[in-house]
């Protein structure tokens, strides 16, 4: 076990109240120690490294200037919250990040009073902060609200909706735009620091308010002329004309790694008590750790790593990942069909569409963190005869549900939806679990909904989606590696709405939707050994259901169990509805539906989550035995 870093100053800081006792001159050393602590912790657990390293000075400055937790501090997404957790009473648990029963990798209300609003999905902080700021006004409270949002999250429409509303309400809200894209070089020198202090001070704001009153008195024409001159003059020096026109005081850009810049600006904004204010802070992802500075993209989310070399631990996979199988199959099909295009919402690497972009750069589009736009953009392409693959994580597809319904499904447009990270995702917990896509897509008329049982099936589904022009079609697959099956040279076109029998039996039928098929086959071995002859079927489709297959299973078995890594209301619910409507439950057929439990399951390894849910080999066997009134035989499902 490597030795913990020496952190004499950080050892004095348990909560922000302790931090506020330090002198300004001590803060650079504190920042170095927080970085050392964070690097050591994440090297042991894995997690999001680069974003947190980039906001160490900013986080310290905010907690130094503002009276948290009475003043509310909200982080957008939360990838950058690790320094915040270290400084807010959670340092003793920081090496449990993203582990079972450990600290969340995001802010969580249930975890600390210093986390006033939970985060994990993008672009929510300004809206939540505005709600809190208005609540403070209604309470006649002087508490401040600070929302920290990254430049990536500012690409989503929700952020601008909130900015527009905050400006119209003249809310006492402080928005800090953390610009770590390195598209703007951090300003340096005394003059830029002076201008930022001047722009945030009472004198400038008072003069600006006086100017507004004067121009209003003089009339609309002079108002427009003077306002335009003032705003463009400020925009020329410090930027921010757009934010000013939304009603925000704009300050910056300022160096987010300089306490000489951060502290006076934050103190001015705190003491002015006005709003809304937007402070543009420029930071560097991975700041203070050379490997992360040199390759920010590779150190955004990391496995466990060696602190000295930066080398990340890599487990040699037994099979290709589902994401890579999807990507390779799509590139293969795109080589043969120039109507195929790919769309991602700021996740080209995560979804595998970076491979399509490399092969066909003009046919792959990263639209930023804008899932709603991504789906309707895909609908427009489909309306013109193209074959768009809108590749999204299951949890992020939720953000675009109205567009899926209104712009795609109602119009019957053949948009293809590869749904990655379906089911349990492990360390990111309930905010990123792919729980609901089957349930919310199967409610839509005319939607084809598939799930891959293994990596070969995924390849078939890519080709099936390419060939299908009858309306929208989706196929889901999990995070991680496949099961190691033989791979076809090219996928086959599946018959829509038809499943398959994988193993024949006579007494119990296990009907799987998705990758739980492997556990169903293992469970069938145990059930056969216990004298319960078991059929295993792969549904392939949740919509349209394979009615013939379901009838066959119901009529020739004493018991049918549906198994899926999804929520209540999905595949199993549709099977149950069909069986009830057909009267196939009237003669005593035992039916059970295994799904993800109706709770928000906390972070753990996916295999542990499936075991807890009863979706693994042992859980399936146990369900059968309980339904039949039998105890689990010794040695079965061991």
Swiss-Prot record:
SMART domains: Transket_pyr. Its EC number is 2.2.1.7. Mg(2+) binds at residues 151, 180. Gene3D superfamilies: 3.40.50.920, 3.40.50.970. Binds 1 Mg(2+) ion per subunit. Binds 1 thiamine pyrophosphate per subunit. Catalyzes the acyloin condensation reaction between C atoms 2 and 3 of pyruvate and glyceraldehyde 3-phosphate to yield 1-deoxy-D-xylulose-5-phosphate (DXP). This is 1-deoxy-D-xylulose-5-phosphate synthase.
């Amino acid at each position: 076990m490597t030795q913990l870093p020496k952190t004499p100053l950080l050892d004095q800081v348990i909560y922000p109240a302790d931090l506020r006792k330090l002198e300004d001159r001590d803060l650079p050393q504190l920042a170095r120690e927080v970085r050392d602590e964070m690097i050591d912790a994440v090297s042991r657990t894995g997690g999001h490294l680069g974003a947190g390293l980039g906001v160490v000075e900013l986080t310290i400055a905010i907690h130094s200037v503002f009276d948290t937790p009475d003043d509310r501090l909200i982080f957008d997404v939360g990838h950058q919250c690790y320094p915040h957790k270290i400084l807010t009473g959670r340092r003793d648990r920081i090496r449990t990040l993203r582990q079972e029963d450990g600290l969340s990798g995001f802010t969580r209300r249930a975890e600390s009073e210093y986390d006033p609003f939970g985060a994990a999905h993008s672009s929510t902080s300004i809206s939540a902060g505005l709600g809190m700021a208005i609540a403070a006004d209604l309470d006649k409270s002087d508490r401040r609200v600070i929302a920290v949002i990254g430049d990536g999250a500012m690409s989503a429409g929700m952020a601008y909706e909130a900015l527009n509303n905050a400006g119209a309400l003249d809310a006492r809200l402080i928005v800090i735009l953390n610009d770590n894209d390195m598209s703007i070089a951090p300003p340096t020198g005394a003059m830029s620091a002076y201008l930022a202090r001047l722009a945030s001070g009472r004198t400038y704001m008072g003069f600006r308010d006086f100017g507004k009153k004067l121009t209003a008195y003089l009339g609309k024409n002079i108002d427009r002329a003077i306002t335009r001159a003032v705003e463009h003059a400020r925009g020329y020096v410090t930027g921010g004309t757009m934010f000013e026109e939304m009603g925000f005081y704009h300050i910056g850009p300022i160096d987010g790694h300089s306490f000489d810049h951060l502290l006076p600006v934050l103190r001015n904004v705190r003491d002015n008590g006005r709003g809304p204010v937007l402070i543009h802070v420029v930071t560097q992802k991975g700041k203070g750790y050379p490997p992360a500075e040199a390759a920010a993209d590779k150190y955004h989310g990391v496995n466990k790593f060696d602190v000295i070399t930066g080398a990340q631990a890599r487990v040699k996979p037994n099979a290709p990942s589902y994401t890579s199988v999807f990507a390779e199959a799509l590139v293969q099909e795109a080589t043969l069909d120039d109507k195929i295009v790919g769309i991602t919402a700021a996740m080209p690497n995560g979804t595998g569409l970076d491979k399509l972009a490399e092969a066909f750069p003009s046919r792959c589009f990263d639209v930023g963190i804008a899932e709603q736009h991504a789906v309707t953009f895909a609908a427009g392409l489909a309306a013109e005869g193209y074959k768009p693959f809108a590749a999204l994580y299951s949890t992020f597809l939720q953000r675009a549900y109205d567009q899926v319904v209104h712009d795609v499904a109602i119009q019957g447009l053949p948009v293809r939806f590869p749904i990655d990270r379906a089911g349990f995702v492990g360390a990111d917990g309930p905010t990123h679990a792919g729980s609901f896509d089957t349930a919310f897509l199967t409610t839509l008329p005319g939607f084809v909904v598939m799930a891959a049982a293994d990596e070969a099936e995924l390849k078939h589904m890519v080709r099936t989606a390419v060939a299908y022009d009858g309306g929208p079609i989706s196929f889901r697959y999990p995070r991680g590696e496949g099961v190691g099956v033989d791979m076809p040279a090219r996928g086959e076109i599946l018959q829509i709405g038809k499943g398959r029998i994988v193993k024949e039996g006579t007494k119990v039928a296990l009907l799987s939707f998705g990758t739980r098929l492997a556990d169903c086959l293992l469970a069938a071995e145990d059930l056969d050994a216990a004298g319960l002859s078991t059929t295993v079927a792969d549904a392939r489709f949740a919509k349209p259901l394979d009615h013939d297959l379901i009838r066959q299973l119901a009529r020739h078995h004493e018991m049918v169990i549906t198994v899926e890594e999804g929520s209540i209301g999905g595949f199993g619910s549709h099977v149950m509805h069909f069986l009830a409507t057909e009267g196939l439950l009237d003669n005593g057929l035992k039916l059970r539906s295994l799904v993800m439990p109706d709770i928000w399951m906390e972070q753990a390894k996916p295999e542990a989550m499936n075991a807890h849910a009863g979706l693994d080999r042992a859980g399936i066997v146990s369900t059968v035995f309980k339904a039949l009134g039998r105890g689990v035989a010794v040695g079965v499902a061991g």
